[in-house]
Amino acid sequence: MGANVDINIKQGDCLELMKKIPDHSIDMICCDLPYAITGKHWDVLIPFDELWKHYKRIIKMGGAIALFCKQPFTSVVVQSNLPWWRYELIWEKDKGTDFGNANRKPLNAHENIEVFYNAQPTYNKQMLKGKPYVKKNYRNNDEDDLNFKSDNSGIWVNNGERTPTSVIKIARDNIHKGTNLHPTQKPVALLEWLIKSYTNEGETVLDNCMGSGSTGVACINTNRNFIGYELDEKYFEIAQRRINECLL
């Protein structure tokens, strides 16, 4: 995986760097924008007017834009381009957070992913695994005995796959194994799920706030081209190392 993908990552202000992206050349934008709630130097709100000016120019017709967020920032994100907003996905984490407030409120165990597009995008259903089931009251009239139980009591109509829902259950990267390298890092498996859902192999994904480079890793793993920008020098170096290791 990833041997023939095109990777283009740069350190700097994404609003300046996106000016160099050709019009309507991006198949998907997948980004965890700064929420401006931590007070950290890297957590500074990007002006939405200017951000959407770039997004609208560079995204292809029918390209999906998936933006991570959580309340109260979620409401701001949705309202930033309501005409293009389509629906919300929920990432359900394997463990809750904010144990310091566990006696005051429920643990935080999810984040929002807001999906925007200007026309129907590629949608490759990422089927869920489940228990195969039998549709009963059908007799075996198939001469080749395909898809039927041997006792003629029913027909296998499903191999266990289920249509995905708006809730995605994926574990966080393990901080104790050194795979969690950024305070707001998203699991590579979750990013792969999104990328495979809304793009095909060989297409191009942009993450204009790539942090430690997880979206780039997910693109390499799924044979997508990647453009990534990061303002912070430390996290850019981490992203560069991770992505280079994946390309070896």
Residue ranges and their predicted role:
Residues 1-228, 234-237, 248:
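Core catalytic lobe of class I
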